[in-house]
Structure formats: structure tokens, C-alpha cells
């Protein structure tokens, strides 16, 4: 819906075929719902470009269908701050759990001894986590004696 998917996103999941749809509410698309059901999972982590519609509508319907829904509030956006916040309120009142991108990232990492994903997680944290990212740099240089990072 609404054009091509960004190549940067497709590059992260090259084996996933996008589901073409015309509805604003992905949960009203049979192919989308079938793909979700095919995973066998009952927990959904979702975000969308348009909070009031493309996030709220499928979140509410997934909750109604018995899914546990986590909405990533800081990777979604509304047409205004108020519209975004009221939509998040509506989903939370219906049972959705609000989370941030960093909560999701670090919950997936869970343990710093997981070396397969450690470096990529640290790169994301350094680039996008503000003061926490700066703290990571500090710890690496001052505590661990790592070389200074170059821009």
C-alpha cells in the first residue's frame, strides 16, 4: 500500500516477499493475516508510518483476535503529536503494550555474551541512543581501553 518498500528495509530481510495490499488496515488483508498466522506466534511487535490508521487499526484487530500486541511508539508517527498520543492511548486502553525501539532491541539481545549480534547492537546503540550511546563509547575507551572511535 502506498508505494514501494524502502530498499534499506528489504535489504535487512531479502528473503521476505512484501505483501501487496490496498487497504490501510493490514489486518483486513487476508494474505497479511495468513502470513501472521503462519508464523505460529501469538506476540506481535508492530510499528507503522501512520499511527492513527496503519498502526492502530491492525493492533486493535489483532488484540481482538487474541494476539498479544506490542506497539513500538517511537518508530511510528502520527499527523500530529496529539494524534499520535491519542492513538497510542486507544491501543493501550484496548490492551496493547507500548514499547520503544531500544526496549525491543535490547530484549532481543538479552545477554551481552551473545556475540553473534553483539557488535551490530552496539553499532545501533552508539549511533542512535543519545546519552546511552555516548556512555557506551566512554566505557569502551576509559574502562576497556579500546582505541578512540573515528567518525
Regions found by a protein language model. Give the residues of each.
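Flexible, glycine-rich phosphate/dinucleotide-binding loops
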Residues: 1, 78, 107
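A contiguous pocket-lining binding segment that forms or flanks enzyme active sites
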Residues: 43-48, 52-101
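Long, charged alpha-helical interface segments
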Residues: 100-105, 109-151
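Structural recognition of alpha->loop->beta junctions
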Residues: 10-20, 87-106
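Short Asp/Glu-rich motifs
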Residues: 3-5, 81-82, 110-111
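Short, hinge-like loop/turn segments at secondary-structure boundaries
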Residues: 8-14, 36, 64, 86-90, ...
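Active-site alpha/beta core segments
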Residues: 1-57, 122, 127
